[in-house]
Amino acid sequence: MSDKKTAIITGASGGIGAGLVERFLQEGYSVVATSRDAHRKLTASGSLVLLEGDIGKQQTAAQAVEAAINNFGTIDVLVNNAGIFLNKPFTDFTTEDFDALVSVNLLGFFYITQRTVKEMLKQKSGCVVSITAALADRPIAGTNGSISMMTKGGLNSAIQNLATEYAKDGIRFNAVAPGVVNTPMHPDDPNDSTLQPAMKKATVKDIVDAVLYLAQAGHVSGEILHVDGAAPARRW
């Protein structure tokens, strides 16, 4: 088994996820990358195990944790990157929309995080970083994602509670809350840049840098790190 640190990254095949995989490998981590189409977008190697599946299913979560332990021996970092965002008026959300958001954003966090924490308790160390959303606590008029933000805001609360629950066990929990990021999830809309005072979208690198900081900052836990070009300042 390798002595390198190991990271599990969900939603790993595109946008922020692909950037996270690349950067963690560059930083010397072994990586287990999960997504629905991991093998189509990524190339496995001695340091990179690919796992395809629906992260909202218990089986996928179990397989990811098993892959990390069986191949690399530990789980040092879990990055809960998988997520979906639906933008529509509250009265237009359907039951199918609600179920999809809960499956990916909540069950996709719950199943794999619970299993990972059980392993981290054995190690007496570990770090969980989750990607949430700046809109969860900084709503913007005209951006109608109330049910999406119900899930992301719930994650923020859970993360802060988990940070307290497991502080004595050496396990840290934090979140990165992006604003608008230049990824395929966000169509090329020139108005997006006006949603934050910086007047430009965040890049994938901006988000990856924030995740790496939280993964390596040993005394930081329970933080929701906004990466949104000063939008919380509400000065524009």
Question: Where in the sequence are the language-model features?
Answer:
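Conserved glycine-rich cofactor-binding loop
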Residues: S13-G14
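Substrate-binding pocket helix/loop in short-chain dehydrogenase/reductase
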Residues: P89-F90, D97-V102, D192-S193
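A short, exposed helix-loop element centered on a Lys and neighboring polar residues
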Residues: T113-Q114, Q160
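Catalytic loop of short-chain dehydrogenase/reductase
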Residues: V129-G154, I159-Q160, T164-K168
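Short, small/polar-rich loop/turn modules that mediate ligand/substrate recognition or access, typified
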Residues: A167, R172, V220-G222
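A conserved structural motif in NAD(P)-dependent oxidoreductases
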Residues: Q196-I207
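C-terminal substrate-recognition "lid" of short-chain dehydrogenase/reductases
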Residues: K205-V227, P232
